[in-house]
């Protein structure tokens, strides 16, 4: 049986992770007056959780209203981000297996453009701008590796992140990438090479 999610002394009775926000609605029947219900944001920091902008009330409808407003705001934020990406790059549809080359256990994917499997992303992130990555290393990038983690740089916005090898749908050759992704690939490789360089070389480059 799955353990019930809690936030401190509160039991989570509803939650929604939308965009960049994890929003929870909680109840504590033993709480002091005025604090029976709670709504807050949850952030994961390493192995710990941090609770932000907590509001409490004995009025369930009031807290549900806050919960709904926060979900709506988070959804609006990610809609705006997606619309901006669509405007900048044009076609931003989810990349499927038909559009990339599958990888095997024998393949190295280091310095390859990898496609994150949309089924491993939340629905609002199933777009090419969130899937195309340069794999820069990690034990999971090696052939026949027992490791899983692959370090990646997003070709759309340059953010650095990591995925498991099992999250990767396949690879795409650079010449098959759309123009925006080719530009992002060049920038990602330049940044990676700069970060690899000894400190002295970095200083001279500046």
List PLM regions with ranges:
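Negatively charged, low-complexity tracts enriched in Asp/Glu with abundant Ser/Thr
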Residues: 1-15
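Charged, amphipathic alpha-helical segments
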Residues: 18-26
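Short aromatic-glycine-(Arg/Gly/Cys) micro-motifs in beta-strand/loop hairpins
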Residues: 25-53
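A short, charged, amphipathic alpha-helix used as a generic interaction element across diverse proteins
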Residues: 58-73
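Mixed-charge, Lys/Arg-rich low-complexity intrinsically disordered regions
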Residues: 72-122
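Preference for solvent-exposed, low-hydrophobicity sequence contexts
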Residues: 109-115, 133-135, 151-191
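Short beta-strand-centered aromatic/proline hotspots
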Residues: 113-150
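Non-Sec secretion/translocation targeting segments of pathogen effectors
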Residues: 192-206
């Amino acid at each position: 049986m799955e353990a019930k999610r809690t936030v401190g002394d509160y039991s989570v009775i509803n939650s929604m992770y939308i965009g960049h926000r994890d929003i929870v609605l909680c109840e504590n029947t033993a709480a002091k007056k005025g604090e029976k219900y709670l709504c807050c944001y949850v952030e994961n920091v390493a192995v710990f959780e941090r609770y932000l902008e907590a509001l409490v009330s004995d009025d369930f409808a009031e807290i549900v209203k806050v919960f709904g407003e926060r979900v709506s705001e988070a959804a609006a934020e990610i809609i705006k981000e997606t619309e901006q990406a669509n405007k900048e790059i044009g076609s931003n549809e989810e990349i499927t297996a038909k559009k990339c080359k599958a990888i095997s256990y024998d393949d190295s994917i280091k310095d390859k453009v990898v496609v994150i499997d949309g089924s491993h992303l939340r629905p609002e992130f199933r777009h090419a701008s969130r899937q195309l990555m340069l794999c820069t290393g990690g034990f999971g990038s090696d052939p026949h590796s027992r490791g899983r983690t692959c370090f990646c740089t997003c070709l759309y916005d340059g953010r650095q992140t990591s995925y498991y090898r099992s999250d990767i749908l396949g690879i795409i050759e650079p010449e098959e990438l759309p123009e925006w992704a080719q530009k992002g690939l060049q920038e990602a490789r330049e940044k990676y090479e700069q970060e690899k360089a000894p400190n002295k070389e970095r200083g001279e480059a500046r």
